[in-house]
Design a protein with these regions (language model features):
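C-terminal-of-GTPase-core extension/linker across diverse P-loop GTPases
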Residues: 1-95
Length: 95
C-alpha cells in the first residue's frame, strides 16, 4: 500500500458507510494528488459506471457527497495526525 491507495480506501469506506447497498462495488476511488505542508491537501476522484450512480453519490443538494467527504476527512485526520483538506470529484468512468 502506498499512501494514496490507503487514503482512497478510507474514502471508499465512507461511500459504503453512507450509501449502504445502494451502489454496487464497482466504484473505485483514485487519489490524484497529495500536497503536504503544515497540513495535507488531498484530491481524489470517485469513478462510477453510470450517471444514476453519480447522482446517488452526489445525493440531493450534494448531501451524500458532503457526508462522505466529512467522514473521510475526519478519518484521514485521525490516521495522519494533522488537519486535512479533502477534495472529492465524482467522475463517470469511460468505457
Amino acid at each position: 500500500y502506498n499512501e494514496g491507495t490507503f487514503l482512497a480506501e478510507i474514502t471508499r469506506e465512507g461511500i459504503l458507510k453512507y450509501l449502504n447497498q445502494e451502489i454496487p462495488y464497482q466504484i473505485s476511488v483514485i487519489t490524484d494528488k497529495i500536497i503536504k505542508s503544515n497540513n495535507y491537501t488531498i484530491h481524489q476522484k470517485i469513478l462510477v459506471q453510470t450517471l444514476s450512480h453519480k447522482k446517488i453519490i452526489l445525493g440531493k443538494n450534494g448531501h451524500s457527497i458532503k457526508a462522505i467527504g466529512s467522514y473521510s476527512r475526519l478519518e484521514m485526520e485521525k490516521v495522519l495526525k494533522c488537519k486535512c483538506n479533502l477534495f472529492l470529484k465524482v467522475v463517470l468512468k469511460k468505457r
